[in-house]
Amino acid sequence: MLKYVIILIVLPIIAAAEIEHARDLMEEGQFEKAMQELLPAARSGNADAEELIGIMYAMGLGVKRDDIRAFDWYLRASMKGHPGAQSGVGWYYEIGRGLPAPDLIRAYTWYVLSAIGGDPDAAISQEEVVKKMTREEIEKAHVLINDYKVWIYPFR
């Protein structure tokens, strides 16, 4: 039993160190190596790794820029409660880049969720997007926020 407890304590520490190493590689411009570090963590469900891969695809860092893949990686991390990725999803919906069209209802929804999660910039984005929305759109967004909030942030 003690062996399993130790494993449960040590594994998250190792995973966090791998993500930090990948961030360091990105800062050094070694994007291909960073991707090699991030993919196994992302495939095992690490939201930080998923968000960083989303950034790489969004900005074309070591990979060809691909808005559809960027959005997908951001969305994976967002559904796990990653506030930075949630702002990324909100931005994609607001601008409509890589999507059929902008969707202000969903943009607002994700900015609000990101703000709930603690992203300090999300409130600014939320204030800007709400200026472009009708009352009805805001009400629809709040229905989505309430749906997502209980699932993504069940204890808030």
PLM region descriptions:
Residues 4-13:
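Sec-dependent N-terminal signal peptides
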Residues 15-36:
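N-terminal leader/linker segments that initiate helical-solenoid repeat arrays
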Residues 19-25, 41, 52-59, 63, ...:
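Hydrophobic face of amphipathic alpha-helices that form TPR/SEL1-like repeat modules
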Residues 43-47, 59-61, 66, 79-83, ...:
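Short helix-capping/linker turns of helical repeat alpha-solenoids
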Residues 121-156:
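Terminal, low-structured helical/coil segments at or just beyond the last alpha-helical repeat
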